[in-house]
Amino acid sequence: LPTYPMEQLAGWKAQLAERGVPIFDFGTGDPREPTPAILRQAMFDGTHEVSQYPPTQGTKPLRQAVSGYLRRRFGVAVDADTEVMATLGSKECLFHLPLTFVQVPSDKDLVLYGEPAYPVYEIGALFAEAWTYPVPLGVHNGYALDPDALPEAVLKRASVVFLNYPHNPTGFCLPDSLFRRWVEVREEYGFVLVSDECYVDLHYDGPRPRSLLEFGKKGCLAVHSLSKRSGMTGYRSGFVAGDKDLIATYKRFRASMGTAPQEFVQAAATVAWTEPKHVEERLAVFAAKRAVLLELCRQRGLRVHGSQAGLYLWVEVPDGTDGVAYAQRCREVGIVVAPGAFFGRGQE
C-alpha cells in the first residue's frame, strides 16, 4: 500500500517544524475551533463510575437522536432500532463496508467511486481484495458521477458503489436527478449504494445538499460524521443509516471486530445530533474563513472549482506546473497544502 496522504502531510509539517519555519497548515481538515462546551460537558457527564462494554449498534438514546436528526434535516424516517448504527467516525465505516459486502471471488467483485476521491474508498476495496473502478470526475462532467456514462459490464460487476456529495475535496453537490438515477440503477444491478455525506451540513452556496435516503432506502446506506460538523475529530463519532438488512449484516461484522464507540463519546454524540445551534455557529466561522481565501485566490488569479460545500477549496494550479510541484513551492515558505494527486490520478 502507498503511504496514506495525510501521513505525508504530517511528515512535511514535522520537517518544517524541525527547521523552525512557521507553518500555515491548509492541508488537513482538522478544525482548530474549540469543541462546543455543551458537547464536552455531555462527554464528562457520560463517564460513569463503572465502565462496561458499549453496545455494538450504539446506545438507544444516540440512535434515537440520529433518527430525529434525519427526520428534521431531510424528512427521512428511519427506525432507530433497525436502521441506524453508531460508528467510530466515518473513515473506519467506509473502510469496512467493502470488507463486509464484497464477496471474492465472485462475479460481483468491483468497488466503484468517482475520482478525485477520499483515499479510503480505494484502500478499503484493496483490503477486501476487490477490483477498483475509479471514474474520472472533472470540469467536463461537473464532478458529477453519472451511472448512464458507465459501461453496463462495470455496473453488473459492481458490488459496492460510493457516492460522496458534497464532494471531498471539490465541494460540488450532486443534482437530485442523479441521486434518483443512481437509486434506479442500483435496483437494476443489485449493488450496495453507499453515500458518504460527511459534509452535508457544511454548505455555503446554492440549494442545501441532499441525502441519498431522501430518494431511496432499499440497498442504500448513508454515512455521517461529527468530525467537522461538530468539531469532534478527536472523538471519532459518526453513524451509518439505511436498509435494515444491510445494517443487520454490518452489525454482525462489527460485533466480531469490536469497534463500538465508547459510551461517553456516544453521550456527547447524542447531544450533537440533537442540538443544531452549534452547527450554525461553526458554519458561520467556516464561511468567514472561506470568504477570505476566495478573495485571496481571486487577487492571485487562482481559479477555484466548486467549493459550494465542505471544508476545502479545490484550486487549479497555474499553467506550466502541476499540483505536486506547486505544493512543494508553497511548502518552501511554510504553507502546507494537499496536492490533487493525493485524491487520484491526473488530479491537478
Where are these regions (language model features)?
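Conserved C-terminal alpha-helix-loop-beta "cap" of PLP-dependent enzymes
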Residues: 14, 303, 315-348
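Conserved glycine-rich beta-strand-loop-beta hairpin in the small C-terminal domain of fold type I
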Residues: 270, 286-294, 304-316
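N-terminal small-domain helix-loop-helix segment of the aminotransferase-like
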Residues: 2-89, 93-96, 272-274
